Design a protein with these regions (language model features):
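S-adenosylmethionine
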Residues: 1-289
């Protein structure tokens, strides 16, 4: 069961909307992201097996380990030692799209609790500098202990008032990579957050849509020449994804869209748009030199 407004939009947008809704009703497994600074997926699976927990590698992300049960993970040594963090496989793929390199300057523009920030930090082997921005001080506060547990020293969390904050403007033209994990309706997370479908109404779409467009505009200004901008949501709605990107590209003809699936494919991650749609959506853009 989904809200009528979402059903009406999905029917128009997806030819296979029935399969999509069925997938939404299934309970989600627990995905872990292995912190490769401290362990390998094989080592984590072996440790879990020794404790009688069945685990397997994820379908797409090289760092993903999937559990069929949802244990009190925070009490386990592998969690306390920073070997794993809880992160949906789709979110792990977004860090792979950013493809940060050692020593680069990176901004996670809407960092939230910092799950993707930590994934970026591990990919950068704790080198360079990552700015983790968010307007929610309470959510961002959880990042510092998680950083320490993960053994990362290259992350700099900062609370901002909005996307036009002076802290943001000071970094215009300085970033190698910027990730915009935009605030959204969360329609792609109903498997994990089933109550969300009744908390977010169609009337809020207009407001959140304006925020999405404003955030991506500001984030783009942070890039240096040859940088990379990644826009992602956990929404299945075209209005929050392709439409936002189309508007942005119309306003910014000096940017071009890359093929996200080719970027993942070159990293050995084979996933089709059909398989990816249950995670939400993502786009990679480059400013023209």
């Amino acid at each position: 069961e989904v809200p009528k407004w979402l059903y009406d939009k999905a029917v128009v947008q997806y030819t296979d909307h029935k399969a999509l809704f069925e997938a939404m009703q299934q309970s989600a497994p627990l995905d872990l992201r292995v912190n490769t600074l401290k362990a390998t997926p094989d080592e984590v699976i072996e440790e879990l097996t020794q404790h009688g927990v069945q685990a397997e590698k994820g379908q797409y992300s090289p760092e993903c380990v999937r559990l069929n049960i949802k244990p009190a993970l925070t009490q386990w040594p592998i969690y306390k030692e920073g070997k794993v963090d809880v992160q949906d496989e789709g979110s792990q793929l977004i860090a792979r799209l950013v493809q940060p390199k050692r020593g680069e300057m990176v901004c996670d523009f809407c960092a939230g609790a910092g799950g993707k920030t930590l994934a970026l930090g591990a990919l950068m082997k704790s080198t360079g500098r990552i700015y983790a921005f968010d307007v929610n001080e309470k959510r961002l506060a959880g990042l510092t202990p998680r950083m320490r547990r993960a053994g990362l020293s290259n992350i700099h969390p900062a609370v901002i008032r909005n996307e036009h904050d002076l802290r943001v403007k000071r970094l215009y033209g300085k970033m190698d990579r910027v990730l915009v994990d935009a605030p959204c309706s969360g329609t792609g997370t109903y498997r994990r957050n089933p109550d969300l479908k009744w908390r977010f109404g169609e009337d809020e779409l207009d407001r959140i849509n304006e925020i999405q467009k404003s955030v991506i505009r500001s984030a783009a200004k942070m890039l240096k020449a040859g940088g990379r901008l990644v826009y992602a949501t956990c929404s299945i709605l075209q209005r929050e994804n392709q439409d936002v990107i189309n508007d942005f590209l119309a306003e910014n003809p000096d940017f071009r869209l890359l093929n996200s699936y080719e970027i993942l494919g070159k990293q050995g991650i084979e996933i089709s748009p059909y398989q990816a749609q249950r995670f939400g959506d993502f786009f990679v853009m480059l400013p023209q030199l």
